[in-house]
């Protein structure tokens, strides 16, 4: 789930309803993502004209639901119900939905995302699952080159939530295979890479 840091308090309930594992927060990650394209102009206007007291309008977020490989009907139904429950909480629709079954996840700076790269070509074997908290030094995946018998284990360099893994299982050197969202800024400038 992606959002402006200033909007995160309003999005925490949706994150809980959807069982999101991490909120990635940035004002301008580059690439004009949906949430920033809708919300950032209001933030910029309020900073440009502070005396006008322009509210931070257009609450927008980008939510990734399960990735391309997850087309499970039960998951899709749960996500749809979570979105409807959030809309009802906001008074935008009528109806009764249960409170979130999960606690809201932590919002992390998008700048704290570590990209774990393939050190060489080979078959990828993931050792951890998306959504898990990992510590710096934890083994995240192995790359096994069947031609040379070279095996490399790639570890997290930061503590945080493992929030994305590459769906393809053959590594190419220099391409990311996993992403960990940490609490401390690691990157600056253009943060979107896909």
Model-derived segments and their meaning:
Residues 1-194:
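Structured catalytic-domain cores with a bias toward divalent-metal coordination
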């Amino acid at each position: 789930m992606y959002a402006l840091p200033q909007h995160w308090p309003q999005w925490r309930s949706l994150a809980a309803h959807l069982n999101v594992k991490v909120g990635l927060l940035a004002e301008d990650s580059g690439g004009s993502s949906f949430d920033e394209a809708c919300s950032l102009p209001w933030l910029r206007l309020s900073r440009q004209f502070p005396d006008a007291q322009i509210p931070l309008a257009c609450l927008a977020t980008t939510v990734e639901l399960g990735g391309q490989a997850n087309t499970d009907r039960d998951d899709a139904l749960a996500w749809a119900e979570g979105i409807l429950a959030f809309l009802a909480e906001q008074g935008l629709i009528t109806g009764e939905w249960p409170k979130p079954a999960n606690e809201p996840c932590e919002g992390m700076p998008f700048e704290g995302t570590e990209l774990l790269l393939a050190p060489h070509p080979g078959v990828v074997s993931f050792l951890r699952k998306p959504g898990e908290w990992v510590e710096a030094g934890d083994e995240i995946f192995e790359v096994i080159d069947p031609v040379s018998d070279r095996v490399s284990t790639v570890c997290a360099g930061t503590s945080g939530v493992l929030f994305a893994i590459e769906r393809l299982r053959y590594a190419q050197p220099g391409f990311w295979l996993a992403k960990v969202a940490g609490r401390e800024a690691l990157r600056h400038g253009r943060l979107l890479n896909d």
